[in-house]
Amino acid sequence: MEDKRNTIDVNEQVSKCESLVELQEILSKNSNYYKDWKQYINRLVERKHMNYVQLSKACHCSRNTVKKWCREGAMPQNRETFLKIGLGLRLNLEEFNELLLRYGRYPRLYGKNMEDAVCLFVIRHYPSEGDAYEVYLQLKEHLLKRMREYGKGDARPLDTMEIEERLMAQESTEEFEQFICENAGSYEESYHKLAEVIQLFIKAKEENVHRFVQTNSLSFSYEKMMSALRQRGECPNRIKLILLGVNLNMSMEQINYMLSLAYMKPMCAKDNLECIIMYAVENAYLMNPAYSVESAIILQHYKQNPVLQKKCRDILAQYWEAGLYAEERETLRYLEESIGDYLKNILQELDWEEQEIFRYL
């Protein structure tokens, strides 16, 4: 509970931040979060009797990356890397989920996600010899090919509990393959609510994903992410998903709602990058009320979340009554700068060292 209270406190501090100086003070206090990860990964390495060379080979990462984890407490940058660590170190299911939930703030292994289903099967049947991550990759690619050949299947859609119970009953690779193919429809639909929300924001700009990415000079990996999300029900990269929300001018509440649809935890100010993103989004909405109006226009007819829908309608009623904007188009024209551009400027002012992030802004 202490950790949870601290997280809430830090999140609240960021929401009240009025300058980059105050933000930097919060960032400087985040060292314990990275210290926890450093202690955790070093304990695992010691328990498994590995050196850096063996760890980098097992986790399919460079030696420099592994050294940064163990010496500096640098966090892995995406969920796939956490999967590499879990499989490389042959963690059991409980340990694997702790790794994902506590340190990655990613969802636990989710049986209704095809990649996770493969991971769950490999964990239950770790090969006696060889590379567990390679086994996972080969089985995943084979199943993706088989699913394309098989089609959606005739099986009725299963809920998460049903699919996970039946997954655990599959003993052979052949049985597992047959189960996945027969339930291909359930796997393809696992993230459809998330894709629906993202599409609402993109369509509001009168563009498809390709046009949105092209017009805003963004990374085409967003297009690939959306394709994988819709066609294969593939779990998106957490930071990339958050940054897509930023580029779509979503509020903090909307980004966190989107994360919940991806079965992920809300944004956490204990993570330095997420802390900066939270500051940028909160400040942008505070300085420019047009962002609130824009997102309210988009979500006013969104029935999947009645609470969010009502909040958006209340915002619109407030602004129309005040007569601040004559019509919707005037509001949208007023937004000359995306929050993504604003975030990029803040990161540059803070001399953010990880250049990879700028690819997505």
What label would you give each PLM region?
Residues N51-A58, N208-S217, L244:
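Short alpha-helical "recognition helix" segments of helix-turn-helix
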Residues V53, N64, E94, E223-K224, ...:
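Key DNA-contact positions within bacterial/archaeal DNA-binding proteins
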Residues N6-M50, L139-R211:
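A short, Lys/Arg-rich alpha-helix, primarily the initiator
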